[in-house]
Amino acid sequence: CIRDSSCWIVWDKCNGDTKWADCELAWTSFNTAVRKFAFMWNGMLQGKNIEEGWIMQGKKHLNEKRIHPTQKPVALYAWILKNYAQPGWKLLDTHTGSASSLIAFADAGYDYVAFEKDIGYYSEYLHRLQEHRSQITLFDCGVERV
């Protein structure tokens, strides 16, 4: 049972005229207004960044690889953290799936605890996290990757 809340998060997938859902909804316990996050997520078409999510990322090699059927973009979690999380919070993800949340948590400097019951997805997300961490270690020196 979901209790009443004034604040829902609406993720507009900016997917145009397709058979897929235009939006996804996330319940929150915050006592604020409904907020919308626009970020393209339609097959190979993915948004550019948090500020320009409705604009297609032009460099396909920078797109997130899909490893889970209900995968969300890292940018969605980054936006949620930016708008709702407080410094010093320790975050919990009980359905980690693709680890998009964990990438956003780590990038923003949050400690976290995560769970995934499917060993296949767990293995995939561990590999994804290791790849992400190695990219940060090797290449993030204030220079934009191309």
Predicted regions and their residues:
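Class I S-adenosyl-L-methionine
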Residues: R3-V146
